[in-house]
Amino acid sequence: VNISLDTLKKETFHALTGRPYFSQVIEGILACQASGIRTKINSVMLKGTNEEEFFDLIALAKEYPVDVRFIEIMPIGYGQQFQGYSKKELLTLLESRYPNFVSVSKSRGNGPANYIYLPGFQGCIGFIDAIHGKFCNSCNRIRLTADGVLKLCLYYESGISLKQLLRSNASDDTILQALKDAVLKKPIEHQFHLKALEGTPEIRQMSQIGG
């Protein structure tokens, strides 16, 4: 189970999410642990917002058998209003307190995260740096939005409407072929690094996209 948690403070949680559900998120994490469900906590470090909680979030992987992953903010929707941290910046900060961390070479799933292990911790610390550490050449992700559009890349607004196909009573073979054709058209790479010059084609919020 992946759970988004950028802060351990109720007030900051409410300010970032617009929802007063901090306690429910914590209860969900604890319920996963009690049930033996493998849990990954995804956090985004934002300058001037929650960076002072970096080590507190890391400590969750010591207290519980969870992986804590730091995701570089993407300039989509509200994300364009914030400044984030790169993997390099966070590793430098982490090394100041935990100089003996160990890189984990084996895969932990089929996602893009790179992991390190801190001695004495139950879980690992992961980093997903989509902007400064492009991994487009190994990306195996597509997304289905709430309104039925299959997105091939977060950066681009384009996609195919599976909802229209389903509502037109298209056959399974037709839908399958449409999926295959779409995947073959998946862009080679995103262009988030051009955001400052050209803007981002995707105009929807991450909550609307499904991420």
Language model regions located:
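Auxiliary Fe-S-binding modules of radical SAM enzymes
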Residues: 55, 63, 73-76, 80-211
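Radical SAM/AdoMet-radical enzyme domain recognition
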Residues: 1-71
